[in-house]
Amino acid sequence: MPYEPAMIRFMVVFTIIPVLWLLWLSFLPNDTLLTVDKTWNYDVSDWKTLGATTILVAMFGWVLQLLFTMTARSERLSAMVVTGLFFHTVPAMCLLAAVLKANVAKDTQLVWFSALMAFRYWRTLVAIFFWTQYKLSEKRVDGQPERYNSADCTVVVATVGPGKNVELFTRMVEAILTNKPKRVVFSTPKPSIADSVRPLVSEIQKQFEARKTGQADTVFDTEIICTGEANKQDKRTQTVQGIKMADTPIVVMVDDSAVWGPKFLETTLPAFRDEKVGFVGTRKWVERLPLPEDDPNLSQYQNFAAKYRAGFWNTIGALYLVRHNFEVRASNTADGGVFCVSGRTSLILTKIIKDEEFINKFLNEYIWAISSLGMEGVGPLKADDDNFITRWVINHGMDVKIQYCEDATMTTQLGRIDQFKFIDQCIRWSRTTMRQNPMALFVDQTMWWKWPISVWMVYFPWLYNAALFWDILAIWTFTTTAFFRESAVQYRWLGLLILVIWMSKLTKTVAWFLPRQNQSDFFWYFFPIPAYPLFVYGHSLLKIYTVATFWVNDWSGRAQDESQRQLEGMKRN
């Protein structure tokens, strides 16, 4: 879409924020011992003032570089876009204002506490606003046919087989068949796995069609292909092999643990009515897993602990994806941006991913590669496939749309105790952020003018957002303010601050606790038992680990050998 609408919203947001910030700073009293001409004094000899000024100058330089880049790429430059780019300096201006105010304020630490809270929570307030403004691409109501329907779709499932979870794999296959795409390609690493998957999928299809025979609208013409031509256990390679077998306008890439609803395709495809949309993401949800049965050989406490552990990890996995739902719905509404279109299920125009340049880059993505210095970089990457595709789409002039509603929901399982790999997944996801966000911000650069709000609301925060350290810093800073020291009810204020920080973690996760069957999770895992907040703090430490190991290039949880044994066992049986 044209850059102007996103830029206008960006300028509005980044006008309101500094105005409110300056207004708040003006309310904070100055030190009465300072002379009048000292008020808001700019003293470059002060290291904090010099540092904030340097950041502001650097941001102006960065904006000029962005303008040069846009010109070199023949991007359309309008007065609105040029003006909007300079609003990227607003955060640096707000920092400088805080430094100058802190130099003259009566309660310097209150200024810094205010700055810290504003820095942490402005994006939450902005995200809430845009979340409420979301609009779904609805199906046509005028009787005219949609641009695309399910027969225009090829579904590609990169898989190593069902492993231990045949039941989930079966539901995934049946859900795809219910939506009636033209073709489903199961792309496996090698022919022997394809030979094991093929009879399983055929049996699932046979039983599914037998159950549906006699019902209304039961014409089944979905073609199923199982291929092992990838010759490599790598999701990117397997996906490309599946893409090669697509002859439809739309390719739907699906994880082998993703289960759709019966109206999934007909609800998501209307997003492509906008010819600028090339990539579509959906709402994600996590299945509530049954708790383990009591073991008579264990004590009552041990049985309770086993149930609590199972429920905890299932809930943590659910909250992880629910947070993502909130983020993508809000950012996509704000300026069309997303941190990533999830690879669990995504729809894309076939012409984008059948391009030879795309395939070559997709299979040979390196990070920190500097050819002029002889640095090959890290790669080719195995993970990060969905981030790469998201970046590719916007860098090639197409838009992204999130279809967020019940019918456009993909359901999966996370936090299974019998196949526990959630921590490994968290590590992989965090490494992906540390690899891909800097690439998007400083190599691609497109989002600075295409998704300007998302730059500051999503891409930068995901790099530095470690709640353990920010929350401790906020509490410590508050206790050093004169306001706190002089208060007669110090610990009531401190308790209120802790409660606000605690409850702020509910903003993006509340959707999970609303259904009746999930309401008890609020008590057991959020409040008053702070299991989820404690996990969030533990994740902050995990994030430091992933920063230090971002170059580790693996894909946790895709155990070919285990899956192969399972499949061969089923085949023999």
Description of each model-found segment:
Residues 139-449, 570-572:
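Non-transmembrane catalytic domains and loops of membrane-associated enzymes and transporters
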Residues 65-69, 81-82, 87-120, 131, ...:
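Membrane-embedded multi-pass helical conduit in multi-pass membrane proteins
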Residues 24-26, 53, 82-90, 158-162, ...:
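Structural motif
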